Amino acid sequence: MIYTDTRDSSVKADFKTAVMGGMNQATGGLYIPVEFPKLDSSLLNKDPAPSFRDVAFNMAKPYVEGEIPDNDLAAIIADAYPFQPKVVPADAISYIMELFHGPTCAFKDFGARFMARTMSYFNRNEDTPLHILVATSGDTGSAVG
């Protein structure tokens, strides 16, 4: 997957650059994917329903393809999500995933934990420690941990 700068679309980056840098220092722009792949409906229509980790793996795979092997991605997801969120019916055809079942009871358990585990993966062979600095209103820092 290729990522582009929100302030200069001629700037391209790979997933590692996007996640480790967060933003383009020259422009101040954020990196975003150049495309947003659709999740195959056959995954969501399985009976029994796929686990949260299975869905997370299939959602993340196109964004990291060529940079994180499948077995490493599965390990990152297992480490980031050692909990199973609840999906509850809202009505006959709609469901809601409750985002307060992670370790900090905050929605950030779902995004921040994956980001931190991915950054740790890319830093695993480096000689310098990885420090993630977050601005927080209270739940972000603990979700990254």
Where are the regions that the model predicts?
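PLP-dependent amino-acid enzyme catalytic core
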Residues: 1-145
